[in-house]
C-alpha cells in the first residue's frame, strides 16, 4: 500500500454524486470509473466528469464509502499535515472556550480527518482510527500528538507545558475496539501507543470527580458530547426525586445527587457500568440507588407500583444504526416516553435524548408529542439540548449532526 501516493490513481465521480454538493464522501454507487489501480488505504485524486480535480481522498474498495475527501487540494497524509489539522482543531475549540484538557480534540470529518477521533482527559489522549487509511498512519498521528502537546511546539496551546517543564502528555491510548471498524475490514483492538500504561484518570464535571479507565472503560472513556448537558440537567435536580434511565456509569445520576436531589435512582442493565458508577459515588460521598434491570421492564413495574418522580432522564443508546430500522426505533421511543410520562409528577421534568442519526429532530419531537397524547398529559418545552461544541456540525455533512434532546415540564391540571 502506497502511503506516499503520487496522485496518479483516483476516482471519477458520477454527475450527481453528493461530493459535488458539499459532502466529503463518495459511495461505491457514485463512482463513474476508477483509474490508476489504487490500493486500499491509498491517498487518491477525486475528479469530476470534466477531469477537474475536486480533492484528495482516502480510498477503500471494501467499504460502502469508497472514498472520503480530506482536502480540496492535492495533499498527502504526512506528519506536517496531521500536525496542521490537529492544531487547527485545537485552536477552534480554544476559540469556543472548550476546556482544552477535557474535550474531543478531533472529531473525524468535522475536523478534516475522516475516521480519526482524539479525546483528551488531562494528560492522557485516546485515539481511534476508524478508517483503513488512517489506521495505517496511526503512528504518524500519535507522533503529531506528541509533537503538539509534549514537544517543542507545545506552545501551540498556551499552558500545555506544566511548570518546571514537565510534559503535558502521559499516554496515548488506542481504543480501536469500535465495531464500526469492521465496515473498513479492520480488526478490533486496544492498547497503549505511547507513554505510561497506567491509564486511569480523573476529571471533574458539575462538582463531581470522575475516575475512568481509558483502556477498558466504555468507548473512548466518557460521553463528552453530553458534557455540558450534565451540568444543565443537574441545575434542575435540587429537592427532586430523580430517575436516571439508561444510566451507564451514572453521570446524570451523580451530578444530580451532587446538586441536591432528594432521591436518585439509576437504572442500568450492565453490571460493569453499575460497578463503575458505585465507585465514583463512593469517592464523592454521594447516595444513589443503583438498579440493575432493563429500563422498559423497570418502567412497566414502576407504573404498576404507582411510583412517581419529579425529574426523569432518558438517555438511551442508539435505537437504530440504519435507515431501515427507523420505524422500529420510533416505536421504541414512543413507548419509552409514554412510560416516562405516566411516572412524572404533576409539574415534573423530563430530559430526553437521542443519539440516533437516522432519527431526525422533527421525528423525535413527534414521537414525544404522540406519547403525550397517549398518556393524556400536556407539557411545555423548556429548551433544546445539542451535542457539545467539541463535536462540530458541518451543514454539508448531515451525519455530523446526530444528537438531539429536549427538556420538558409537565403542565398540571390539564
Predicted regions and their residues:
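Conserved SAM-binding loop of SAM-dependent methyltransferases across substrates and taxa
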Residues: 249-261
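Non-catalytic accessory regions of SAM-dependent methyltransferases
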Residues: 1-122, 150-151
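Conserved class I S-adenosyl-L-methionine
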Residues: 239-246
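S-adenosyl-L-methionine
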Residues: 272-310
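Mobile active-site "lid"/loop adjacent to the S-adenosyl-L-methionine
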Residues: 273, 309-339
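C-terminal catalytic and target-recognition region of SAM-dependent MTase-like enzymes
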Residues: 308, 335, 349-414
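Conserved SAM-binding motif I beta-strand of class I
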Residues: 263-268
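Non-catalytic substrate-recognition/targeting regions of SAM-dependent transferases
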Residues: 106-119, 135-150, 165-222
Amino acid at each position: 500500500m502506497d502511503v506516499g501516493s503520487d496522485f496518479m490513481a483516483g476516482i471519477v465521480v458520477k454527475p450527481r454524486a453528493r461530493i459535488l454538493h458539499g459532502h466529503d464522501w463518495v459511495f461505491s454507487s457514485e463512482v463513474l470509473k476508477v483509474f490508476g489501480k489504487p490500493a486500499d488505504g491509498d491517498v487518491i485524486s477525486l475528479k469530476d466528469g470534466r477531469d477537474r480535480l475536486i480533492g484528495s481522498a482516502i480510498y477503500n474498495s471494501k467499504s460502502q464509502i469508497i472514498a472520503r475527501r480530506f482536502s480540496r487540494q492535492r495533499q498527502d497524509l504526512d506528519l506536517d499535515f496531521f500536525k496542521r489539522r490537529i492544531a487547527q482543531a485545537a485552536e477552534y475549540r480554544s476559540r469556543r472556550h472548550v476546556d482544552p484538557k477535557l474535550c474531543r480534540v478531533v472529531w473525524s470529518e468535522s475536523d478534516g480527518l475522516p475516521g480519526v477521533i482524539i479525546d483528551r482527559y488531562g494528560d492522557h489522549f485516546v485515539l481511534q482510527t476508524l478508517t483503513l487509511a488512517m489506521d495505517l498512519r496511526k503512528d504518524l498521528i500519535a507522533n503529531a500528538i506528541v509533537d503538539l502537546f509534549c514537544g517543542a511546539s507545545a506552545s501551540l496551546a498556551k499552558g500545555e507545558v506544566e511548570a518546571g517543564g514537565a510534559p503535558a502528555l502521559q499516554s496515548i491510548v488506542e481504543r480501536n475496539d469500535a465495531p464500526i471498524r469492521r465496515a473498513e475490514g479492520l480488526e478490533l483492538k486496544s492498547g497503549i501507543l505511547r507513554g505510561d500504561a497506567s491509564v486511569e484518570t480523573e476529571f471533574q464535571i458539575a462538582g463531581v470527580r470522575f475516575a475512568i479507565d481509558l483502556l477498558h472503560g466504555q468507548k473512548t472513556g466518557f460521553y463528552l458530547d453530553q458534557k455540558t448537558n450534565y451540568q444543565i440537567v443537574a441545575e434542575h435536580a435540587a429537592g427532586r426525586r430523580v430517575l436516571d434511565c439508561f444510566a451507564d456509569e451514572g453521570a446524570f445520576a451523580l451530578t444530580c445527587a451532587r446538586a441536591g436531589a432528594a432521591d436518585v435512582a439509576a437504572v442500568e442493565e450492565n453490571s460493569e457500568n453499575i460497578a463503575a458508577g458505585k465507585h465514583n459515588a463512593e469517592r464523592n460521598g454521594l447516595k444513589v440507588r443503583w438498579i440493575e434491570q432493563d429500563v422498559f421492564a423497570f418502567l412497566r413495574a414502576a407504573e404498576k407500583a404507582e411510583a412517581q418522580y419529579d425529574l426523569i432522564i432518558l438517555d438511551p443508546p442508539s435505537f437504530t444504526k440504519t435507515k431501515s430500522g427507523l420505524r422500529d426505533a420510533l416505536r421504541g421511543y414512543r413507548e419509552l416516553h409514554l412510560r416516562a410520562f405516566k411516572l412524572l409528577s404533576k409539574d415534573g421534568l423530563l430530559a430526553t435524548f437521542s443519539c440516533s442519526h437516522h432519527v431526525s429532530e422533527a421525528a423525535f419531537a413527534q414521537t414525544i408529542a404522540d406519547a403525550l397524547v397517549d398518556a393524556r398529559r400536556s407539557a411545555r418545552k423548556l429548551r433544546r439540548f445539542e451535542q457539545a461544541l467539541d463535536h462540530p456540525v458541518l451543514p454539508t455533512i448531515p451525519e455530523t449532526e446526530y444528537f438531539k434532546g429536549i427538556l420538558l415540564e409537565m403542565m398540571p391540571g390539564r
